[in-house]
Amino acid sequence: MSTTALAELPTAITLDAHQRACVISDLHLWQDRPLTLARFRACVERAVRECDALIILGDLFEYWAGDDDLDAPAIAPVVSTLRAAADAGLLITFMHGNRDFLAGASFARAARLRLLADPCLVTLGAQRILITHGDALCTDDVDYQRFRTQVRDPHWQSQFLAQPLAQRHAIIADLRARSEDRKARAPQAIMDVNPQAVDAWFASHGVDQIVHGHTHRPGMHHTPRGTRWVLPDWEFDDGPQRGGGVFIDAEGIQPFDA
């Protein structure tokens, strides 16, 4: 394995042997989901008691229109919860998802968290665990990957964020409606990760464990190259209740329910 490839992947968190991290993603928090918000708060409170770090792998919010929307009813309670946990000594890190990729420095300062590159590493002793939101591995969805490249471009983001907040909300609503329509018509297989892309990441980054969200297909998958852990999405307001994540500590990776 080339050391150059390994050096290019940043380390998000280095845990000591006695430390523990809580990893969650895809909560899609919003003002019309009070029960899910309550479960999130309970999870953060548990992390303060039992963990040293909270790692959020994207899609914490249903969507993000810009850091000038921090006082919105859907966002302010979440920021307040994170800030209180950080003030209590919890290290909080956040990786962008496909819903909240516009969250920026002002959000990070308000919530007292650190923004992460995607992908990056969590290390604990000999353990090297790659963490990612997961959408970059869904390479069979060519249209989505094209869209992802466009909206992650700094120039596109600058132009979008220069528009009035109300207009941004309207544009996002339209994009979400189109996305839901496309997902309803597209083959379900392309919404999942591509096995060859996963194997390529195992090989090029020198890891044997990957943790990601995005697909809403929780589980543990073994391949000859390593183990892939898929985090659950969260839903406690409508439909079947679900939610949780994984703990990372000296004993390895353990899933938990919210």
Residue ranges and their predicted role:
Residues 2, 6-20, 29-124:
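Core catalytic region of metal-dependent phosphoesterases/phosphodiesterases
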Residues 25-28, 59-60, 98-99, 134-136, ...:
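Active-site metal-binding loops of divalent metal-dependent hydrolases
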Residues 19, 23-26, 59-61, 168-181:
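Short, basic/glycine-rich phosphate-binding loops at helix/coil junctions
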Residues 110-117, 128-130, 135, 141-147, ...:
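Conserved beta-sheet core of the metallophosphoesterase superfamily
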